Amino acid sequence: MKLVTFIHQDKERIGAVDNLGRIVDLHRAYASHLQKVESTSAGDRLAEIVLGRDMVEFLKRGNEALAAARNALDHIASYDVNGGGVFDRGQVRLKSPVPRPGALISAGKNFSDHVAEMASKKGPTAPVAFLKLPGTVIGPEDDIPHPSEVKNLDYEVELAIVIEPGR
């Protein structure tokens, strides 16, 4: 499942990409699922409780939130949802999937192709690691803030691994 954090109408939302490549607002889709399938009128409130308010809360909720997200996506695939919450990619602005993560420990110079592109042309003899401040994480469409004196910016590949509790 591809999880996303996105902005729609100036509001940050958590979502997932459906099998058609659309962005699904998980809160709205799960609330619709609860109202239609579970026959509850408290779908909006229950969706927030089960899924969390943001991606960090969603991830902390673990399997229960993941099951709810799957139900939301199945619901979208099975029903004609008129309440909205399903967007074409161009209708939303993607943010970093986890906009406010905890500690980030990064490995530097870990791809030989990237090392070869760098001026030193020599890989490290020992592992290189560094910390990132959580506020430095941005989305794929965001500008990279930097001082005007900076003439060259380097890129890096990002990979997130979310490990399920008990694994």
PLM features: residue spans?
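N-terminal non-catalytic cap/leader segment that marks the start of a structured domain
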Residues: 1-125
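Glycine-enriched loop-and-adjacent helix/strand subsegments that border the catalytic/binding cleft
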Residues: 93-167
